[in-house]
């Protein structure tokens, strides 16, 4: 026997599969049972529909044609045949063998073909061209070649495939070497091919495909068509966010609540609620995966943020907090609490005396242990287990002293939507590191949670919960992939939402595949893909069964805010139009048409702005078939313009080297094709741009100039006029002139046409390009002035009086207006901080010459504020994020804010702030940012304010007392210290100057603990720095702080005070190892293990630091404190 998994051009072989021999006897080609069992062993989890084996004895092998078919055979309700290429397929060195699945229509065609041949008739059908475009069939199979007389002389290859109309057969191009097929080998004394005959056998295992995607290539897969749902695009590392968003989207009551948040006047660039509404509506209506870029931009994230994976629980809370703030004062205030919030009671109850201390708190989700817990029920029992406090851990009960007590938590109420966070990441004490817990942890489709409620909880309604969402993580602590399994409706199937792809899912995929650990019932010796062990559930979403109809009530069009629906429907229509246009571009050429009438309506530079939208009144946008000729184009345009075809002339407009677009040549050859003209003169992807000259008006102009026909004229020009009163430049006429005539020859016609007196002086300019306009000599000829076809001449009535004092007319001549147009820039002004709700986003048209004073005055007029209170910050483009404050207003012009890549079609962003003090005062002030530690070191609040640059730390502390409600005694104990990279740089005295603060550090302000202040007044205490780290000193985290060492205090007693200062519970503090660190070096920590050790007198505050070695609260210690928490505007 030859056992082979040959790689063929058409095949991805299952190289891990091996056929096991049950005895010492060699495997036989006719031992179908053993071959079948080996197929099952390789894919034991797949559900079988049918299986069959079949052998085909091929006779006269050497005389066969290039392609030969076996008789048909059945496997259950499916029909198959073997396809043999005896001389090879796409090569000549190997025989090729394939397995083909036959849809019923093809089976019937083959039967009919064979019947007609048997009856001596000419076949009326070729069965090989008959096909069914809709079928698919999944199967494992083993194909073997063997000697007809000796089945042990064999070669066997195995594979699997999704048979479909695009790839109807599958097998092996290089099955057996034709040079060796008919000769004995060292392994086999007889050849495969003997007496010109050979046996080909197949065992096929037809498999169920309940999800429709088994072994799917996903080429041209359409989630909307196959499942009715669409996915979300991954921006780089946003799969964790996508899985949560899909879960929230299918929590219908949440989606309805989000839709009720008022966002009529919001901008999706900075409103999370509005951006989320848009994402949700797109998920309802789009046929393609939905982008989340707009949503993350509303968070204030840039592309770098989108490539960082975050904790899903933290992201969920930050998102909900943001929405809650937006809901305040609206009809949906507290609506999220009604959906997600339950109550739990933490208690300590004395055993021997009647005393209980308890606190009832809201929870948004429940964190449950996985390690050591076989089932979800075990995790709930673990969560509410009672801890007994005895011995050294007795509880101090006020009025009763130290008492034995029971400590624990119990649930008072559970929410309608219950989000369970499975603690898949935890600290491993033995390995001394954070690890992912891949233990098997089973969860049910339905669970009764009433046993975990307190005795006083309301149990009048059932607390049975139904599983509706499983969020899955695959990978380890350092990264991986996330997706969601969701049941969208009460009685629907389950679906897998994997970023932009949505597929149907089985119950096994929902439950068994995500329990983690080794799957139950795994066959002994199975050597399949071990990565599955690392794919497991990390968040479960249960809906209260009695409230299912409420939670999943259908979302209707009326639930969607009108402005969201209207705006996005229009955006979708625009997208559809663009798709249609792209399709039409293969047949049609878009044509932008400028006429004399349009030219007269235009007031900018050049002939017109061809980047304008299709509804621009200056231009006409139409289309013409690419194979149409110029005469067809002329008839088409004449009809659009309601003119006779003989009354118009078409001119092609092209790009000049100076980046202007001008009339170039007349399209007089009527038989030439539109595409031929375009290929010769314009770029392939560019619209065809034409100017339509009205000949009736042209003939009148000829008469006005005393000419008889066109031969008297050889230059075609365009006239513009600058009107001093309206402060506009406008198109006036298109003229044919003689190149030998002087420029002044235009004057008589102009005066007559505009009814000016004959003595009005006229000044002429040539509009060459942006920023270049030349004065023309009226006595020079058109030829000498280098005026050619398509050139633009602008003229004006020369002012005869001094207009310098006329402020209502800033442009004194055409040159002034041309200069403005050349340096014109649109600035988009945005509030520097998103919480500035009093002011909005607006555009102003200014010039690159605009200085700071003029810009401030223009913005102040718009905002109705004093310009002296405005401060501006330039922006990064294209991210539209703040870059740097304008520090030197006296030297600033808008040119400083314009990037070199700026084009006149884009807006430049500038951020503004309305200050509480004037800008001049601000120059004497310094912005101070501090973090106030309000509850020990466990809570911090960031605040900002200005203080005098010459001020002191006392000024900072005074500002803090104005922002935080403190009594006089606490205010007197405030202290400020600086931290950099989680190390204390310096503790400041109130008299220290502001200039002493390091601009790169973080300033922390706290109320010095009263007992610490009292202790330090004695000789029995010393203050020392405490610093957090994880395993080594390059991995610092959390906020360092000051702590007091007491004379004679043992390490055991110190730990109790330290735990209280940190605010850690027993579980958290059990992970902390105390160590002595060298203050001025990165030497190895000296770990403290003797509880009787006394640190006072052993540690010097200037030389030592008390180190706390433990994993950070967020589960990911970063080097040098570079970890970034999730932030949203």
UniProtKB/Swiss-Prot annotation:
It is an enzyme of class 3 (hydrolase). Residues 51-204 form the MATH domain. Pfam families: UCH, USP7_C2, USP7_ICP0_bdg. Residues 1-26 are annotated as: Disordered. GO terms for cellular component: cytoplasm; cytosol; nucleus. Belongs to the peptidase C19 family. This is Ubiquitin carboxyl-terminal hydrolase 15. The gene is ubp15.
